[in-house]
Amino acid sequence: EVTKPETINYRTLKPEMDGLFCERIFGPAKDWECHCGKYKRVRYKGIVCERCGVEVTESKVRRHRMGYIKLAAPVTHVWYLKGIPSYMSIILDMPLRDVEQIVYFNAYVVLDPGNAQNLSYKQLLTEDQWLEIEEQIYGEDSELLGIEVGIGAEAVKRLLEEVDKTSEAEKLRSEIANCKGQKRAKLIKRLRVIDNFVATGSR
């Protein structure tokens, strides 16, 4: 995990530890040399320095090793939203246009319809519609309970968390066995994506 905004130390010209170029995370800046210089040369290949925690290997590993930054709020990754096919809309079983409306703060989404008869799960609402419902919820003689509505990446995160991938995959398999044509192809595409998530243990 990258925890510091620093890149390179201006005096030593070496990458800062836990920074954006950290050698412990991404690998050594120089071939076969750890950060503190205790291990140098190929003969120490594969050793992790006990002082600085850097693995003695080739510097080219820095090109493909990945780190991560813990964000303060959820953010929607454009690859999963805009990629073809859009994995986000496939998993949520929603049209891409609807998912974009939520992500770009153009529409609210119903996360829990509560006891409201005119609302359904994943239904999109305009700002005016939501304000109208809010007035009804907080009205004096209101009987509306348990209604939850969200917007932005936080709402999308909640919807994704609520997808039970294992049971969804089983449900899709039984549906695929009983349908044909374009609907079957669409279900197979969705099952493939969900199966990949289950196989890799991704959340």
UniProtKB/Swiss-Prot annotation:
Please name the Pfam families in this protein's record: RNA_pol_Rpb1_1 (PF04997)
Q: Which GO terms describe its biological process?
A: DNA-templated transcription
Provide the residue positions that the database annotates as binding Zn(2+).
C34, C36, C49, C52
Class in the EC hierarchy, top level: transferase
CC terms in the record's Gene Ontology section: DNA-directed RNA polymerase complex
Keyword terms, alphabetized: DNA-directed RNA polymerase, Metal-binding, Nucleotidyltransferase, Transcription, Transferase, Zinc
Tell me if Ribonucleoprotein is a UniProt keyword of this record: no
Query: Its catalytic activity?
Result: RNA(n) + a ribonucleoside 5'-triphosphate = RNA(n+1) + diphosphate
The GO molecular function terms of this record are:
DNA binding; DNA-directed RNA polymerase activity; metal ion binding
User: Record keywords: Hydrolase included?
Assistant: no
Q: Paste the cofactor note.
A: Binds 1 Zn(2+) ion per subunit.
Q: What is its EC number?
A: 2.7.7.6
InterPro entries given in the database record: DNA-dir_RpoC_beta_prime (IPR045867), RNA_pol_Rpb1_1 (IPR007080), RNA_pol_Rpb1_clamp_domain (IPR044893)
Q: Which cofactor does it need?
A: Zn(2+)
**Protein family:** Belongs to the RNA polymerase beta' chain family. RpoC1 subfamily.
What does the record note on quaternary structure? In cyanobacteria the RNAP catalytic core is composed of 2 alpha, 1 beta, 1 beta', 1 gamma and 1 omega subunit. When a sigma factor is associated with the core the holoenzyme is formed, which can initiate transcription.
- Record's function text: DNA-dependent RNA polymerase catalyzes the transcription of DNA into RNA using the four ribonucleoside triphosphates as substrates.
Q: Which named protein is this? A: DNA-directed RNA polymerase subunit gamma
Originating species: Prochloron sp
